[in-house]
Design a protein with these regions (language model features):
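Glycine-rich, flexible loop motifs
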Residues: 26-74, 104-157, 251, 266
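C-terminal auxiliary extensions adjacent to catalytic cores
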Residues: 26-47, 51-58, 62-65, 70, ...
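FAD-binding core of FAD-dependent oxidoreductases
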Residues: 78-92, 96-100, 107-132, 160-182, ...
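Conserved, non-catalytic sequence blocks in retroelement Pol enzymes and Pol-derived host proteins
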Residues: 136, 165-167, 397
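Cysteine-centered functional microenvironments
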Residues: 159-164, 341-345
Length: 515
């Protein structure tokens, strides 16, 4: 009996470990809330996708309802038994409904410009699968499962950045994402770009036969904009945290004052992000010898003194934008909306990108400000004041030191200012004026992506400067947290004694922020 109990215990342990391992490596698509953090985890860790039983049932139920409605009625349903856009009054015969969907995908694949980065295309696939799984779109189960096959097998549809107006959904990029389902378009697989038909043959997959409405379900949606937004939010949270840490190092290197971060000051103007940033700065600088030494100056420049007010506003903006995008990625955003429970098929406007276009513009403005204030601190560090040598080099004149790092930061910051001009202010009517207001949210997404990368570059340049400046304060030391950050940075980027080629070191600083 004892041996039997022991064997059962071991078997149960092995089964538990196996289940836990499977669950850890597989994310089940369901109606449960999908967080932005979970999306990041799925992409970063290569977690596989599978449909939950409930999701399968919802997809099948919606498809069955739609088929029954088409069979039972001759009443035109937009995009299901009619043409698209301003052709909505042109009725299509039932024997041409599948071809209608393929024609839609082919004709709408008009993307130009650079490719959407692979990481963002993978987010796009995940978000499209999630949206279709709610059972309001009318997709067939095999269509959704093939999208999951693409995701799990590392098949990346080739999608181009430009072409979407961000209303009627992201028609152009989602057309490129969807073409490989039917053996058209291109994919990247194992680092090689190939025709989708070749990939299907390689995998032994048959092209999907689209049913009525499926092309619309795939193309009408905000998943291109949303995927850029999710990626940008994940980076924005990382950069916001780094901005505080780097500002703390810059402040100590500049012989700045700690008093502006006193809690009492911020309690009388209690914006959440401001309070958080002030507390974070105090925490980062706790134990610093430099911060405790007597100060000659009464005040610091705004770029140091107002870190809580500026960085804090960025935090609050990130928080707001995150709440909007969180709702968006847990929504069905195509048209028409099929509601089996309510016995309704309604042509409406859930594809319109305005709810996320404005927040993406807002986030681009916020991150641009994070870069703006960072560049101002860089300027202070290289200006030869408060006991620091001009351009942070021991022998200025013979050496130019960090002079041009500030030029680079200023150039990038200036570019950000133009990129942060809101795209959502613009609207150009299309489709014979049937689509007479559009969000331009896809343009907001593209610009936000660039602003994120530019802001990262400026913060990396500030860290490069701050680490150099801090060493001119030795043997006095900053706080344990700042000194550990400095120590880790020095493993990647050395102190600069005499002039060297700087751009590889800036790139190393950028990579350091990504670790």
């Amino acid at each position: 009996m004892a041996n039997y109990d022991y064997l059962c215990t071991i078997l149960n342990y092995k089964i538990t470990i196996s289940i836990n391992k499977t669950n850890h490596m597989t994310h089940y698509i369901s109606a449960e809330h999908l967080s932005i953090e979970r999306v990041g985890e799925i992409i970063e860790k290569g977690i596989k996708l599978a449909l939950s039983d409930d999701a399968k049932a919802r997809i099948q139920r919606c498809r069955k309802y739609l088929d029954e409605q088409i069979a039972a009625s001759d009443v035109p349903v937009y995009g299901v038994t009619t043409g698209f856009g301003s052709l909505c009054n042109v009725k299509v015969s039932k024997d041409q409904l599948s071809q209608l969907q393929i024609n839609l995908m082919m004709s709408h694949a008009c993307g130009v410009g650079e490719r959407v980065p692979n990481e963002i295309v993978r987010i796009m696939l995940l978000l499209k699968i999630q949206s279709l799984s709610y059972g309001y779109s009318g997709s067939k189960l095999d269509t959704v499962e093939r999208l999951i096959d693409f995701f799990n097998e590392g098949v990346i549809p080739v999608v181009y950045r430009q072409g979407s107006l961000g209303a009627s959904g992201d028609l152009v990029p989602l057309a490129h994402m969807s073409l490989p389902l039917v053996g058209l378009g291109e994919v990247e697989y194992e680092g090689k770009v190939m025709p989708a038909a070749e990939l299907l043959k390689l995998k032994g997959w048959e092209p999907i036969e689209l049913a009525s409405k499926e092309g619309l379900a795939l193309l009408n949606g905000t998943q291109n904009m949303s995927s850029f937004a999710v990626w940008s939010l994940l980076q924005a949270e990382r950069l916001s945290d780094w901005a505080d840490k780097i500002a703390a190092m810059s402040l100590d290197a500049y012989d700045g004052r700690i008093e502006p971060f006193t809690e009492a000051v911020h309690l009388v103007r209690p914006h959440k992000g401001q309070l958080e940033t002030a507390a974070h700065m105090k925490e980062l600088l706790t134990g610093s010898e430099l911060i405790k030494q007597p100060k000659v100056h009464v005040q610091d420049p705004y770029s140091f003194r107002c870190v809580p007010q500026v960085h804090g506003t960025v935090k609050d903006t990130i928080r707001y934008v995150k709440s909007v995008i969180d709702t968006e990625i847990n929504s069905a955003t195509d048209n028409p909306t099929v509601c089996p429970d309510d016995d309704l098929i309604i042509s409406a406007g859930n594809f319109h990108g305005e709810p996320i276009a404005m927040p993406m513009d807002f986030l681009a403005i916020a991150l641009s400000e994070l870069a703006n204030i960072s560049e101002r601190r860089i300027y202070r560090l290289v200006s030869g004041t408060r006991g620091l040598p001009s351009f942070l080099v021991a022998n200025p004149g013979l050496n130019s030191g960090f002079m041009i790092t500030q030029y680079t930061a200023a150039s990038v910051v200036s570019l950000n200012k133009s990129l942060a001009a809101p795209s959502s202010l613009d609207s150009i009517p299309s489709c014979q004026d049937q689509e007479d207001h559009v969000s331009m949210g896809a343009n907001a997404a593209i610009k936000l992506y660039k602003v994120v990368l530019n802001t990262e570059r400026v913060l990396a340049i500030e860290l490069f400067n701050a680490a150099q400046a801090l060493e001119f304060r030795f043997p006095k030391k900053s706080s344990p947290v700042v000194m550990k950050m400095h120590e880790d940075f020095r493993k990647e980027v050395p102190f600069i004694g005499d002039d060297v080629i700087m751009y590889p070191l800036i790139e190393k600083a950028i990579q350091f922020l990504r670790k």
